[in-house]
Amino acid sequence: YHRSGKGVLVTTTTHMYVEADTDLSCDFFALRDKIIKDGYCMAGQKISEQSKPKMCGLPYDLLDRLIKDMPQALDYVIIEADGAKHHSLKYPAADEPVIYPLTTDVIIVLGTWEKGKLCKDVVFRYELMQNELGMAEDVVVDDSVIDMLRQVYVKKLRDSGFEGRISTYYR
């Protein structure tokens, strides 16, 4: 989006690793100025000082204010909502996905590069998936497993009251 001249803010609802040039100030004016100047800003709150620092998302009141006060400069807010801890696929926990209340569109990203491998080796929270769905130990990732995970996410989103658009990106 940024390459097409659109103003973009990127954050998370839970936590993620801090990328280079991420703004961790949680300062409205600093974030506003960066979006206006650069057309792009990744932002959050720092939560760890480890060798690879992590951040959590912007406070919702700050996110609300940025969206409300910057309609001329902020075209898209992209919020990572449910990471898979470096796995290609994930089975969501009971309280996931966590989405920002004013979300209009959700893109479910599903990794397809590990088809043919055992689910237990590539699905984050496989044990939960196995317990809830009664899957056998030797189930292999194929299109039906990937589609089942997509359906689980869609159901959880709809059950949570999300009425916006849901699309899927197969990576």
Question: Positions of the model-derived regions?
Answer:
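G-domain G4 guanine-recognition motif of GTPases
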Residues: 13, 81, 111-112, 132-139, ...
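Phosphate-binding/switch loop-helix module in NTP-utilizing enzymes
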Residues: 48-91
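A short, acidic, amphipathic alpha-helical segment used as a generic capping/interface helix at domain edges
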Residues: 140-161
